[in-house]
Amino acid sequence: MDVVLSFLPLIFFLIALLYSSVGHGGASGYLAIMGLLHMVPETMKPAALLMNVFVSMVAFIRFSSVSELPKGFFIALIAGSMPAAFFGAMIPVTDEVYRKILGVMILIAAIRLTGFFNVPERVIQVPAAYIAILVGLSIGIVSGITGIGGGIVLSPLLLIMGWAGLKQTALISALFIFLNSISGLLGMAMTGFLPDMEILYWTIAAFCGGLVGSWIGSRKLPPAMMKKVLAMVLIFAGIKLILQ
């Protein structure tokens, strides 16, 4: 176990690299690995959210140079999600319930990585503000409870519903994850959480991975084969968490 723990910064670097290439922060990947190592939710959630903040920030900056943020739609989306993520982070759940919810979210992330939701470009039609608020609210509460940023749910929804194109989806997801993760961390701070040095080391590694991955995703072709390998790992981790 100690040997595996020593490789965690490298593992988180690689996860951040892959996720940031599609505008995500990587929380579901970090949580899957920590879940396999039987870490407690009190460590898993804040660690994933903190890494999410820095990786999604870099991804947003990268993708903002190749796409434009639909401001009205995004404001409505985040108006629902940020308060929900804040209060969701303060909801106490048992270890068993947490792992089962997390397992389901990780399986969704795995399906997303396989390219299942990669639909062709279509005419973009932004939904009404109240729909965006309700979507944000629903994703935000799950985000706060589990410690994910919500991008693994939002991205496929944007593409399937035709609310954004591929690059724009990455841009929207990155900022959505960034703000939700900050909101979740603030909610956890209300319960007395303070990050330890180990989590800070992981965050630095993830940040570096995000720098590389977001550049690849915004300027080059995404590393498709590596994403499929990661998807297999996530499927295994998600099923394991659900069955525990």
Where are the language model's segments positioned?
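Helix-loop boundary and gating motifs at the non-cytosolic
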Residues: 27-28, 151
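Transmembrane alpha-helices of multi-pass small-molecule transport proteins
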Residues: 47-62
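Short hydrophobic/aromatic, small-residue-rich stretches within specific transmembrane helices
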Residues: 48-52, 173-177, 198-203
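Residue-level micro-sites within transmembrane alpha helices that shape
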Residues: 15, 51, 111, 146, ...
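Juxtamembrane transmembrane-helix boundary motif
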Residues: 1-20, 29-37, 41, 58-142, ...
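Membrane-interface alpha-helices at helix entry/exit sites of multi-pass transporters
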Residues: 40-50, 72, 163-174
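Structural signal for alpha-helical transmembrane segments and their flanking helix-loop junctions
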Residues: 133-187
